[in-house]
């Protein structure tokens, strides 16, 4: 039974990996030919490389992990690994993509109807984010650690940030009448940047998002938005 559950989890992750390969821009960073490896053997090897990198990142700084390390952990010949990922950065970029999908899916389960005011919903989103990092510290490491691969120059990180902001914006507009002045999405992006900055500070000081900095991020985010949003937004009828 447990083996079947594990197979289902692997299939789910691999489906997400297939989505990456369909994305033409991201695929250029991951594989030379995005349609090349669809066989069961190819999927299994790609999955082993991803999980090998993830396991190594539990105990080692990401920047210290080499492609050779991942191949050894995964039991995949290095020559074969190049068919799936051109370098170690591509493996961690793929993991970051998978993490982002999972984070978005979890945050989408936070229902705005469960909270009387927008402050409660925002607090729940922030707390749920930290809960994800508590459950899997490798996710926080890949986002906030100083020793992560340099992904600057691609729009991937920005795209993920925008998707989170879009999610929060959609939930707010579904429930509340938002002010017609200013750009609320831009306000939420600034809010996200405030939260992200405080989380980064916490992680780089303590290698985790501490309760203190979780509270600081929540206070700062709500305080900023209170400059533009009333305490009680009118609800849509």
State what each model feature region is.
Residues 2-60, 69, 73:
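Basic, helix-initiating cap at the start of DNA-binding domains
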Residues 56-90, 94:
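Helix-turn-helix
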Residues 57, 91-102, 143, 160, ...:
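Alpha-helical DNA-contacting segments of helix-turn-helix folds
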């Amino acid at each position: 039974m447990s083996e079947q559950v594990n197979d289902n989890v692997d299939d789910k992750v691999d489906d997400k990996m297939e989505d990456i390969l369909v994305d033409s821009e991201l695929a250029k960073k991951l594989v030379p030919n995005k349609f090349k490896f669809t066989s069961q053997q190819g999927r299994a090897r790609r999955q082993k490389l991803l999980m090998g990198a993830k396991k190594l990142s539990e105990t080692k700084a990401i920047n210290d992990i080499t492609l050779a390390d991942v191949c050894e952990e995964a039991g995949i010949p290095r020559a074969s690994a190049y068919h799936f990922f051109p370098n170690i950065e591509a493996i961690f970029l793929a993991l970051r993509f998978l993490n982002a999908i999972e984070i978005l899916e979890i945050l989408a389960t936070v229902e705005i109807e469960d909270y009387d005011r927008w402050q409660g919903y925002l607090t729940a989103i922030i707390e749920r984010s930290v809960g994800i990092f508590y459950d899997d510290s490798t996710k926080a490491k890949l986002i906030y650690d100083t020793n992560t691969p340099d992904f600057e120059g691609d729009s991937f990180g920005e795209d993920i940030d925008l998707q989170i902001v879009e999610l929060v914006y959609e939930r707010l507009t579904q429930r509340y009448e938002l002010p017609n002045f200013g750009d609320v999405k831009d306000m939420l992006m600034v809010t996200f940047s405030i939260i992200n900055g405080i989380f980064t500070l916490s992680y780089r000081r303590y290698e985790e998002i501490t309760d203190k900095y979780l509270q600081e991020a929540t206070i700062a985010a709500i305080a900023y938005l209170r400059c533009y949003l009333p305490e009680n937004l009118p609800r849509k009828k």
